[in-house]
Structures are given as structure tokens and as C-alpha cells.
């Protein structure tokens, strides 16, 4: 429990978190958002795990498991985990 609270605290303090920590927060029910190249992206959970770009109808991605979500989410066909060092403003979703 303390680990998740430490991560939540890091996000509130606007500290960087790793891709694995980002996925861990999502796995534990947190809706997240971030910016990549001035574009806003978010994640949520309805019927599995969803990833989307804000205010865009295309490009919505949905996966049944957190493992599939973690491995496959992408921006412009590039895996998010490979782009993570360029992600900015990681926060909880609005």
C-alpha cells in the first residue's frame, strides 16, 4: 500500500515516474494523462484498458489485460514505452 501512495505523491508533486510506475498506477485503477509533443493523451478503464488522444475520434486503443495494454499502446505506431523519455506533464486525468 505504501508503494502506491508514494507513487501518487510523486505524481501530485509533478515528479517524473517511470513507464513501469505509470502502468502500475493504471493497473491499480488510476486514470492517467500526459503530453507527448504538445498532444494530450489519456488512459481509462471501462471494458479493459483504454488509451486515447484527447479530442480525437481516431486512434482509440483498447486492450483486455494490463499486460497487453502495457506492451501495445502506441502513438503514431511507436510503442509508448519506447517514447517514454519524451513524455511530459504526467498527471491524473481531468
Where in this protein do the model-derived segments appear?
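Negatively charged, low-complexity tracts enriched in Asp/Glu with abundant Ser/Thr
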Residues: 1-33
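Acidic, low-complexity, intrinsically disordered interaction modules
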Residues: 27-30, 34-35, 39-74, 81
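Mixed-charge, Lys/Arg-enriched low-complexity segments
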Residues: 3-11, 64-94
Amino acid at each position: 500500500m505504501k508503494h502506491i501512495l508514494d507513487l501518487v505523491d510523486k505524481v501530485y508533486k509533478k515528479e517524473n515516474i517511470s513507464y513501469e510506475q505509470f502502468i502500475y498506477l493504471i493497473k491499480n485503477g488510476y486514470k492517467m494523462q500526459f503530453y507527448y509533443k504538445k498532444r494530450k493523451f489519456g488512459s481509462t478503464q471501462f471494458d479493459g484498458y483504454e488509451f486515447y488522444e484527447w479530442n480525437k475520434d481516431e486512434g482509440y486503443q483498447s486492450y483486455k489485460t494490463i499486460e497487453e495494454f502495457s506492451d501495445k499502446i502506441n502513438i503514431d505506431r511507436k510503442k509508448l514505452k519506447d517514447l517514454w523519455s519524451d513524455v511530459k506533464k504526467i498527471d491524473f486525468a481531468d
